[in-house]
Amino acid sequence: MAELRSNMIKQGIDRAPHRSLLRAAGVKDEDFGKPFIAVCNSYIDIVPGHVHLQEFGKIVKEAIREAGGVPFEFNTIGVDDGIAMGHIGMRYSLPSREIIADSVETVVSAHWFDGMVCIPNCDKITPGMMMAAMRVNIPTVFVSGGPMEAGRTSDGRKISLSSVFEGVGAYQSGKINEEELNELEQFGCPTCGSCSGMFTANSMNCLAEALGIALPGNGTILATSPERREFAKKSAKQLMELIKKDIKPRDIVTEKAIDNAFALDMALGGSTNTVLHTLAIANEAGVEYSLERINEVAERVPHLSKLAPASDVYIEDLHEAGGVTAALNELSKKEGALHLDTMTVTAKTLGENIAGHEVKDYNVIYPIDKPFTEKGGLAVLFGNLAPDGAIIKTGGVQDGITRHEGPAIVFESQEEALEGIINRKVEAGHVVIIRYEGPKGGPGMPEMLAPTSQIVGMGLGPKVALITDGRFSGASRGLSIGHVSPEAAEGGPLAFVENGDHVVVDIEQRILSVDVPEEEWEKRKANWKGFEPKVKTGYLARYSKLVTSANTGGIMKI
């Protein structure tokens, strides 16, 4: 074991004041020779995915003590994307990722911890902590709070939060009545945990296994299961082994490991937000990773599992089918799909972790020789509308649609788009453009779950494409193309589209383009008046000035 970092604050005559303060915090004489462990929690009462994490902190701390460490728990913030949806709150969601990363870095660096257990669960908390782990680069293990159970209606149908969002659109279009909508509301989110489909939170917690920074089971063991508590204990004790062997996050999160994470993402049809977050994590790990490489992964990795919101198969079903290890093991049967030699927090390779974990239900995880589709569940599109790329969750597109073209109908904000959709300005065949909603323009790159849910709920899902420099909830589905880069606020092409322009979305060819004569296009660019920031004070104003477009992960640069 390497010399303890924490000796910086606890050894030597000149550290007597430091030790005095540590004694006031409960440190005993016998503790000063032990590793000091940061327990980075994210317990918060208003977020159902985090409401139970106070208990997890206690479990983890006790396990650390039993394994010979001295735990110190601290908390970071969290935003519930579902509750923040559709109003100013959503503009704080992505920016909260940076606050989380900065706050974890600050506490760990200021106090010279020897190792860290991160306890995240929901959308921005997990990647925020991952970014911080790459920065501080001390032995770290991730223990998510676990997924929520799927809801069930009175007739036994499985539902989730996305069912409730889509229910609003169905009610407004007269497809269901208020009583039916109320039933969705009552049963959509039945327990604590991250929302029950392959949405952003569960996508990131599953990817943590493929990256190698969490033990097998992190992504799929239910929040309500006793197994989740045992998992937390096991993870905390494993951290002590990582300290002994001096295995750090940057030893684990390499270019190959990121390939593996995206391979799992492709196989399970994860949220488009995983691209945004994983690029940001790669940046903090010092790994250069391009959008083009993501398409290369998609070309060689098949889509093996179609999960909610694209189907009625939920994370609990994925767990019963063998979980992430089974999905990865099935993928490994195709040559070149995975790098099996990458290191993980088990102190073993990914290949060793997944060996022998066979699929238990091929109706949930398809066989490698009979995949759902031959190509992965995410795609990066390029073209004159997205020179630096745009993302679509192909696994969430209904009816196998691979191409859509039609006239643009342009909205300057999500709120304007929602009003237009509700007032039936959007018709079958349209390409809905929602611009000035990127990281800088939003600001904060708000999610477009409300517009996509309205479109699907009104029966227009397969008939309308939606393109934005904003992003989508993992609960979104349909022809939803987001992360368009450069964003409109930076003078990206999306700023120059006008109503009626002919727009082409071609998933197979990875194309996103608009048919406008060059002379007309240049005229529009010359007449563009630039972007006036929407928020001029507070954190969002600072964020808007420093943040970059989605193709870089939406990171902040000075």
Curated annotation (Swiss-Prot):
Pathway in which the depicted protein is active: Amino-acid biosynthesis; L-isoleucine biosynthesis; L-isoleucine from 2-oxobutanoate: step 3/4; Amino-acid biosynthesis; L-valine biosynthesis; L-valine from pyruvate: step 3/4
Binding, Mg(2+): D81, D123, K124, E447
Gene Ontology MF: a single term: dihydroxy-acid dehydratase activity
Alphabetical keyword list: 2Fe-2S, Amino-acid biosynthesis, Branched-chain amino acid biosynthesis, Iron, Iron-sulfur, Lyase, Magnesium, Metal-binding
Gene Ontology process terms (BP): isoleucine biosynthetic process; L-valine biosynthetic process
Residues where [2Fe-2S] cluster binds: C122, C195
EC number: 4.2.1.9
Pfam families according to UniProt: ILV_EDD_C, ILVD_EDD_N
Oligomeric and partner information: Homodimer.
Protein name: Dihydroxy-acid dehydratase
Native source species: Bacillus pumilus (strain SAFR-032)
Name of the coding gene: ilvD
